[in-house]
Amino acid sequence: MTTMPAQRANGAPTFKALLLAASALLPGAGWAGHALAADAPAAALAPDNADAAAVDALVVTARYRSEDVQTVPIPITALGGQQLEALGGTFNLKQLMQQLPSLNIQGFSGRNQTTTIRGIGTNAGGTNDGLEQGVGLYIDGVYRPRTGTAITDLVDVESIQLLRGPQGTLFGKNTVAGAIDIRTREPSFTPEWRGEVSVGNYKYLRAYGSYSGPITDNLAIRFSYLRNEREGLYYNTVYKKRWDNLDNNAYRLDLLYKPTDDFKLRVTADYSIQKGNMGFNVVTAVLPTTKANGSVVRGFYEKAASVGYTPLAIDPFARKIDLDNSQFDRMPSWGVQSRADWQVGGFTLSSISAYRDWRWIPNYDGDQIGANVSTQGIVDTVQTQFSQELRLVSPDERRLQYTAGLYYFWQEADDWTTSAYGRDAAKWLLGATYPDAVLNGLASVAHVVPATHSYAAYGQATWNLRPDLRLTAGLRYTYEEKTGLYDAKVGGSAVAIADLPTAWQALAITARATYAPVSRYEADWNGDNVSGLLSASYDLSDDAHAYASYSRGYKSAGINLVRQTTGVDIFVAPEKVDDYELGVKTRLLDRRLELNANLFWTTDENYQANYVNTTVSPAVTYIANTGTLRSRGVELDARAAPFSGLTATLSASYNEARYQSYKNASAQYLTSYQGVKDLSGAEASGAPRWTVAATLRYAKPITLAGGDGGEAYIGGDYSHRSHFFAAVNDDIFSLVPGYQVFGLNGGVRSDKGWDVSIWARNLFDEEYFNTLSVNATYGIVQGTLGEPRTFGATLRIKR
């Protein structure tokens, strides 16, 4: 791309300039493409080509056909197994986010993870089980509704594809923002085994082993085991030990039965458990005590003094914490799934069945500081799900190609929420003169049970009008039923009211009713929707393809299963998304350069977001509709092989995400959360304006000792994200600064199957935040930190 966007005085390109720059690719690509060579044979999903100065074709299966990614009229970023290995020290999707622009994952625990694409999805905040996810996560075709899956270890990954925009006519579960499609390696009838050991600083150890081979002539097996451990990245000054450690194990058993060329059955069972002293926030700043109107409130240091607590110095990147109560996370997960594929007359009929069980067993320090205010804040969760999908894919190479499917999904979560209060709670929360016994030992215990039944029929057809022109239409019908139970009671071992001094009894009754309210209700909802897709794609030449599309996405209504307070509605209206895409995909310079660009314009009506009601104590996290959100921008994907051995990739996104209509936003901290604020026209939360990811790799054939062939290689990666607001009300104290991270790796690979490398992530030890939250109750800003510099070595063996 030779045309540079016009710049503002401060260096930020205007939206109009970006549109013009991206649009300029269309005619240029059409002119250049006619002079290029004919299509080369497609290769398997692979990120580079060290043997020739040309970019390998990327073959993706997003539409359930093996297709050259350049001809698929969808904005896709794909990572292959070799590219994942080259990143070094990377083991989960949250870390891979750095290489997937437009994707943003925030959170601090296995349960509280939120995901957005282009600013649309689920914003940061306490996870609410009554809220559907806007980004679909699929592993081998099975939908994973729990966002905590994003931070678990990835095993046997063959490819990861990020599809942007609504995908309801392709996938079983409807999604409004896009989909993350993860595919794993099938069992092989040729015996093979893989082994990997990585060691690094912070006592990092990752050991992986996998064997695959035939049991009989038509039955193959793959068994894999992964161990991942690391000491903590933070030092707890109270417990005198390091926290935020990893203690993970994952097992996977895969069977492939293939009696004929026309039928195969794959059955997979997996189990993983993640453990550690993790899931906490650090204090990043102290909130001012003087508000915008000049009023003064009790601040963090005054409250701390009232209970005899001496806080640590505010220095988040010293990575010191003083949590004084036990904190741990246990996250076991297991599942069984089967996929049967029949091929009859060129048609493929697939059946995908899956049952999964996910549990979150935490014990959290409720206040996340060294005072004994909230001694416990947990949501013990058991989530189970079942899904069944039937899908028919028509033969390739026909004038009309189509996919049609039926889908059923059920999930239920069984949550037990506990908030317990300690000896400092009364003085901190109520006033310095209150006796400790007013709240000490009090606990609020709530049983929350949301359940969903989802039924859908979907289809998508492509009509090849001419060899160079295709029209695609898709339609989806969704019907969903939701139920919910919320049952809160008083628990704990607080002193009886009658045993308190008479002067405090009335105040204690009010305080306990506030912090441990009794409430019970049930709710149910049902509704349906029709959504769809229209697109056209045109071959400007053999090596240049343009497309335009419109799609409607839908996310069903939500149920607020929280303590009911003023302003909190039980039901949240469904979310509807209209998405427009205009893109071009090109191969240039005799296939040494692959350059793709697309413009997007997305309008999200009734955007569902996490709110925090801080006008009540304790604060209540709930979901509500913000109004209308608009996301528009430009995305760029490029791969290049300038000369033999050198490969480069670049993915970049400019996203202007704003609230178009948001007149009733929660007020911000400096206004004491009084009233509402009109944020119409303001930046949407969780949406960095700029995201960039780039990699560079050079490999050179060498002769090893003993005469064996091999190659030496070196590579680097770069990621940048600009600032964004973490809070839905754009509170200035939730502004997450932009950051950039570099990685480096290099090694030697033998033709005999071994590979030894060294690597570093966050090479220059960039200090950055993943997310920030405003905690007015404690008078502080809390956040989660990006990982510090990590480095190590890896040995891989493949046979």
Residue ranges and their predicted role:
Residues T127-L131, P187-E192, T216-N218, D262, ...:
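Short loop/turn motifs that connect adjacent beta-strands in outer-membrane beta-barrel proteins
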Residues M4, T603, S719-A727, V748-R799:
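C-terminal beta-signal and adjacent terminal beta-strands/loops
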Residues Y402, P467, L471, N596, ...:
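Gram-negative outer-membrane beta-barrel transporters
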Residues R339-Y364, D539-K555, F571-V634, R639-A641, ...:
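Membrane-embedded beta-barrel scaffold of Gram-negative outer-membrane proteins
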Residues L233-R242, G279-D322, D365-Q376, T418-H447, ...:
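Solvent-exposed loop segments that connect transmembrane elements
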Residues A53-T190, L582:
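Acidic, small-polar-rich N-terminal luminal/periplasmic segments of exported/outer-membrane proteins
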Residues M1-T90, K94-Q99, D261-D262, V336, ...:
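N-terminal Sec signal peptide and the immediately downstream disordered periplasmic leader
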Residues E132-G134, R146, V155-R164, T169-T237, ...:
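Outer-membrane beta-barrel translocator/receptor signature
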